[in-house]
Each structure stands twice: as C-alpha cells, then as structure tokens.
C-alpha cells in the first residue's frame, strides 16, 4: 500500500519536476499526452499510473475529468503538521492543521512541510515552543543535523548522532537528557531534517 510517507522514486521525481517546470514556464500543468511524449511512454495509462502514485504520496492533487487536472500540492502552500497520532503517517490528512503560503524553494533542500514545535528541548539552538519548523522529508541524515524523529509513536526534534547501531538524539537545553536508541531493539524512523524556521509572531 502506498502512503504519503513513502519517498518518491527517481522517475516519479523527474515527472514531478516536469510538472513543476511546465507550470512555471507555461502557467498550466501538462496533459497526460505531454507527459507521455516527454518520457517516452507508449500509453497514457503509463502516465496515469505515475500520476496516481504521485497523488497517493501527497505530491499532487488530481482533478477528475480534466485534461490538465493536475495541481501541485506545494502550490497550495506548505502543510502545517500539529499533533501526530500513533501509527499514522506524518502527512496524514488529519494531522494537517493549516497550509501556509510559503515558497518551499526558499529552503535548501526544499521544505515539504512545517511542524509545530512543542516544548523547549531545543531552546539553545534557537528552536522554541510554538515555532514552525520547516522540514525536508528524507530518511537520509548526517551526524549533527537537526532531525524530526519518530520513536515509539512519539515525534521529537533533536540533533542526530550515531555510533554503529546506537543513535543519540541530543537536546539543546541542559534541562533535558539525550534520548539513546539501540536500533537493534527499538524502531526509529527519521521523518526529515530541519531546513529552516518560521517564528510564531504572536509572542
């Protein structure tokens, strides 16, 4: 079963980039036939299969019955993820509180969603309660990067370090203890890396 948590394949990323380029250069999305021509597909069904997979993964929205009924989700704004229910994908519909009209390309790499920060464990890194953390979805992470991690259905923002199977999720506040995870015995999912911050202007 395909979920929004699944990463894009190389071909899916190429098709998404083609859709994005067509929208930016021509002001409209491509047709299925144009996608077939661009990628050498023999049948519009091949394009349709890729499009439906992109929709299932949350990259686009398909409008039934329209030749150019393809909308980029990023054009709708970055989704703001609030409370995350146990066992559900990060970008499940019920987790999205709102969408912010922020250009995802302002961040490098491109932001996929915003996460509402809860608590002060990353205070000394400048990340505080109610901030909106811009996150790039990727399971690939390097030591020293600030990550969004899911551990036993709890989501946390911490600095990532690793020694073999032992992962340490480090806070940036002396009032909090590091989280030590032995990945041989505990499931740890990296939901993405922090690529920017939107400060809550209400404070």
UniProtKB/Swiss-Prot annotation:
InterPro entries: LexA (IPR006200), LexA-like (IPR039418), LexA/Signal_pep-like_sf (IPR036286), LexA_DNA-bd_dom (IPR006199), LexA_repressor (IPR050077), Peptidase_S24_LexA (IPR006197), Peptidase_S24_S26A/B/C (IPR015927), WH-like_DNA-bd_sf (IPR036388)
EC main group: hydrolase
EC number(s) stated in the UniProt entry for this protein: 3.4.21.88
CDD domains listed in its UniProt record: S24_LexA-like
Feature type site, description Cleavage: 86-87
Gene Ontology MF terms in the entry: DNA binding; serine-type endopeptidase activity
Family: Belongs to the peptidase S24 family.
Protein name: LexA repressor
Species of origin: Aromatoleum aromaticum (strain DSM 19018 / LMG 30748 / EbN1) (Azoarcus sp. (strain EbN1))
């Amino acid at each position: 079963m395909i979920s929004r948590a699944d990463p894009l394949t190389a071909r899916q990323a190429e098709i998404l980039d083609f859709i994005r380029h067509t929208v930016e250069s021509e002001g409209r999305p491509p047709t299925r036939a144009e996608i077939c021509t661009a990628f050498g597909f023999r049948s519009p069904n091949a394009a349709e299969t890729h499009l439906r997979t992109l929709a299932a993964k949350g990259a686009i929205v398909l409008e039934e019955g329209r030749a150019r009924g393809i909308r980029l989700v990023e054009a709708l704004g970055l989704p703001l993820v609030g409370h995350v229910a146990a066992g559900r994908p990060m970008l499940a519909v019920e987790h999205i509180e709102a969408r912010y009209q922020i250009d995802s390309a302002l961040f490098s790499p491109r932001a996929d969603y915003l996460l509402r920060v809860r608590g002060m464990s990353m205070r000394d890194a400048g990340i505080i309660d109610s901030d909106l953390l811009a996150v790039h979805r990727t399971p690939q992470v390097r030591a020293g990067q600030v990550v969004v991690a899911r551990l036993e259905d709890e989501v946390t923002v911490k600095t990532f370090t690793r020694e073999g199977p032992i992962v340490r999720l480090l806070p940036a506040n002396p009032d909090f203890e590091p989280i030590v995870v032995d990945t041989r015995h505990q499931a740890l999912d990296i939901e993405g890396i922090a690529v920017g911050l939107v400060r809550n202007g209400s404070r």
